[in-house]
Amino acid sequence: MPELPEVEVVRRGLEKWVVGASFGEVEVLHPRAVRRHAPGAADFAARVSGCGVTEARRRGKYLWLTLDSGEALLAHLGMSGQLLVQPRHAAAERHLRVRLPLTARQGHDPEAPQELRFVDQRTFGHLLVDRLVDDGTGTGLPSVISHIARDPLDPAFDEDAFAAALCRKRTELKRALLDQSLISGIGNIYADEALWMSQLHWATPTEALSRSQVATLLAAVREVMVAALAQGGTSFDSLYVNVNGESGYFARSLNAYGRNDQPCARCGTPIQRETFMNRSSYSCPRCQPRPRHARA
């Protein structure tokens, strides 16, 4: 599933190619793509068609386009969702779910019309239209994600509040990092990478962490995510691409995730894979020793 860096790469592409344009007649080709929009596909198309796009924003793994109607077009990419900006005459992708034609904006060729396409092979992603609520800083946030915590790259992220909440969790450290109501944007890949960088085991009890360990962990999370952003995110297959259909290449820089039995870049010990929450966790048994009082 795309995590913060991948979603931010898509957001930046939307900011470049879609903000300032307006939508033409929206066409929903597969109703499952808008299943979270309770009034249905026809209402979704009617609410988006003709609207102008004023900004592209993100919180954690969610992104949205603010519309001049005062509402937001919210997107969650799920496992395989893609938002692509394509020439309107380009052949339809096999798993094209929603077409959102774009009017020409300043600097774009009106003779080469484009459209935003939502493509989703596994149909776990979705689009919906939602009202905006104040997020406490005077900025609008779609109401359905108002429970999602700020992410570590958000300028308004409160490190002290996070540290206190983390220690109150009394759970495994990785489980806490994956809790989007505590800190958003982190998934399996970047949790493993940040834990490797900070030399903490995923089963470390959160209540046992010192303030300096939390600070080291947050610094690692930010460093990993900034590095991933610079490389366009992590792509293991063709399911994650940016708005121009290009894959990221941070997979070449991973130190832990997916590197079972390969030598640790820091000490040479083979990376080990363990099962956690029905998924895989990767760590170095020497650099990240399992704590004596591990929670799992």
Swiss-Prot record:
ZnF locations on chain (FPG-type)? 255-289
Q: Which CDD domains match?
A: EcFpg-like_N
Tell me where on the tree of life, at the top rank, the source sits.
Bacteria
State the reactions this protein catalyses. Hydrolysis of DNA containing ring-opened 7-methylguanine residues, releasing 2,6-diamino-4-hydroxy-5-(N-methyl)formamidopyrimidine; 2'-deoxyribonucleotide-(2'-deoxyribose 5'-phosphate)-2'-deoxyribonucleotide-DNA = a 3'-end 2'-deoxyribonucleotide-(2,3-dehydro-2,3-deoxyribose 5'-phosphate)-DNA + a 5'-end 5'-phospho-2'-deoxyribonucleoside-DNA + H(+)
UniProt xrefs under InterPro entries: DNA_glyclase/AP_lyase_DNA-bd, Formamido-pyr_DNA_Glyclase, FPG_cat, MutM-like_N-ter, Ribosomal_uS13-like_H2TH, Znf_DNA_glyclase/AP_lyase, Znf_FPG/IleRS
The record lists DNA as bound by H95, R122, K169
What processes does the entry annotate via GO biological process terms?
Answer: base-excision repair
Q: Which UniProt keywords apply?
A: DNA damage, DNA repair, DNA-binding, Glycosidase, Hydrolase, Lyase, Metal-binding, Multifunctional enzyme, Zinc, Zinc-finger
Record's cofactor remark: Binds 1 zinc ion per subunit.
Coiled coil segments of this chain: none
Q: Which residues cross the membrane?
A: none
Q: Active site: which residues?
A: P2 (schiff-base intermediate with dna), E3 (proton donor), K61 (proton donor), R279 (proton donor)
EC nos: 3.2.2.23, 4.2.99.18
A single GO molecular function term of this UniProt record: 8-oxo-7,8-dihydroguanine DNA N-glycosylase activity
UniProt cofactor(s): Zn(2+)
**What task does this protein carry out?**
Involved in base excision repair of DNA damaged by oxidation or by mutagenic agents. Acts as a DNA glycosylase that recognizes and removes damaged bases. Has a preference for oxidized purines, such as 7,8-dihydro-8-oxoguanine (8-oxoG). Has AP (apurinic/apyrimidinic) lyase activity and introduces nicks in the DNA strand. Cleaves the DNA backbone by beta-delta elimination to generate a single-strand break at the site of the removed base with both 3'- and 5'-phosphates.
Its family remark reads:
Belongs to the FPG family.
Q: How does it assemble?
A: Monomer.
Q: Which NCBIfam families match?
A: fpg, PRK01103.1
Which protein, by its recorded name, is this?
Formamidopyrimidine-DNA glycosylase
Which source organism does the UniProt entry give? Thermobifida fusca (strain YX)
